[in-house]
A protein has these predicted regions:
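Bacterial N-terminal signal peptides that target proteins for export
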Residues: 1-12
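C-terminal and inter-domain tail/linker signature
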Residues: 22-164
Length: 164
């Protein structure tokens, strides 16, 4: 039989539950905001990297150096030298070799400090290009680590599915 009174134990449990739910929601919102910020920054950096032939190559490199890649950048792709300076040097040579280089982003995802981009890169407008996945670890608004995999887009496929 209910007397209409709430015990101190029940009241404290209710208060604790409300506080905990509020903290979890705040943490989730902060995590979501960080993930959105990391994704937005990675997309910005990839746009500067691959899709801005209107900018002088030296200006693109400076933007990438100052705004996108951490001084302590770590590269995991086995065909690319480690470090920010080596990576920026590679980009500078690519701009000379492939002045019509372009990239379209097909899919994105982010979780915590990681961002994934599924991309289609083309050296020239008429080339089939390549499919790639970039994984970036972000810290303080900059790319601090990169993992990448890629494969050429074939003329013919053994299935009816697209790579993108």
């Amino acid at each position: 039989m209910s007397t209409g009174k709430i015990s101190i134990k029940t009241l404290l449990f209710g208060i604790f539950t409300l506080i905990l739910v509020g903290e979890l929601n705040a943490e989730e919102s902060a995590g979501t905001a960080l993930e959105e910020s990391n994704l937005k920054k990675a997309l910005y950096c990839m746009d500067i990297l691959e899709n801005r032939p209107d900018l002088e190559p030296s200006h693109r490199i400076e933007i990438l150096r100052n705004e996108c890649y951490s001084e302590n950048f770590i590269e995991h792709a086995p065909n690319i030298e480690d470090g920010r300076d080596a990576l920026l040097s590679l980009f500078a040579s690519r701009y000379k070799k492939y002045p019509e280089l372009s990239m379209s982003i097909k899919r994105t995802a982010s979780e915590g400090d990681l961002v994934w981009l599924h991309v289609h890169v083309k050296h020239t407008p008429d080339s089939l290009g390549g499919a790639g996945v970039h994984i970036f670890r972000m810290k303080e608004g900059k790319i601090v680590e990169h993992w990448g995999v890629g494969q050429p887009v074939p003329k013919e496929s053994k299935n009816n599915n697209t790579m993108f």
